Amino acid sequence: MVKKVLLINGPNLNLLGTREPEKYGTTTLKDIEMEAHQQVAKHQDAELFTYQNNTEGFIIDRIQEAKQQGVGFIIINAGAYTHTSVGIRDALLGTAIPFIEVHITNVHQREPFRHHSYLSDKAIAVIAGLGVYGYTAAIEYALNY
């Protein structure tokens, strides 16, 4: 049986590599996705889907589609929606697909409004502050889940 993993990136993550490189580094989202596909390709029984959107409703739609596709694990960096979106939280809960929340920076070292996540209490794990390596760690976990 093929393990299907969905990697979702939210608003402004399409700007990685150029957006505040002192915080987020110079690695682009395309680089992250390419590395993720290479990592998953080492496992013959795994498939990776990647998705990025700046619009909350489209992210919710993609989470709901994941259930229909038989996705068994979601890795999500919801970006700013982490701190505001009950809708994304409800979509994740509604599909009952296990997920890991990933953040490139340590959100707890940043502005106070970034300290609260609508996702973390329901996530299997939260990875924050490891830079883009957080995606690698999350994928490794998902593949062995």
UniProtKB/Swiss-Prot annotation:
Q: Which UniProt keywords apply?
A: Lyase, Quinate metabolism
From the Swiss-Prot or TrEMBL record, what is one GO molecular function term?
3-dehydroquinate dehydratase activity
Its BP terms in the Gene Ontology are:
3,4-dihydroxybenzoate biosynthetic process; quinate catabolic process
State the EC number(s): 4.2.1.10
Describe which pathway this protein belongs to, using the record's wording: Aromatic compound metabolism; 3,4-dihydroxybenzoate biosynthesis; 3,4-dihydroxybenzoate from 3-dehydroquinate: step 1/2
Q: Which domain of life is it from?
A: Eukaryota
Fetch the InterPro entries from UniProt: DHquinase_II, DHquinase_II_CS, DHquinase_II_sf
**Sequence positions that bind substrate:** N77, H83, D90, I104, T105, R114
Residues at site: Transition state stabilizer? Answer: R19
Q: Which Gene3D superfamilies does the record cross-reference, listed alphabetically?
A: Dehydroquinase, class II
- Report the top EC class in one word: lyase
Catalytically driven reaction(s) = 3-dehydroquinate = 3-dehydroshikimate + H2O
Does Zinc show up as a keyword for this record? Answer: no
Pfam families to which the protein is assigned, alphabetical: DHquinase_II
- Active-site residue list: Y24 (proton acceptor), H103 (proton donor)
Q: Which NCBIfam families match?
A: aroQ (TIGR01088), PRK05395.1-1 (NF003804), PRK05395.1-2 (NF003805), PRK05395.1-3 (NF003806), PRK05395.1-4 (NF003807)
Describe the protein's quaternary organization and the partners it interacts with.
Homododecamer. Adopts a ring-like structure, composed of an arrangement of two hexameric rings stacked on top of one another.
According to its UniProt record, which protein family does this protein belong to?
Belongs to the type-II 3-dehydroquinase family.
UniProt function note: Is involved in the catabolism of quinate. Allows the utilization of quinate as carbon source via the beta-ketoadipate pathway.
Q: What protein name does the entry list? A: Catabolic 3-dehydroquinase
Name of the gene this protein is made from: DQD1
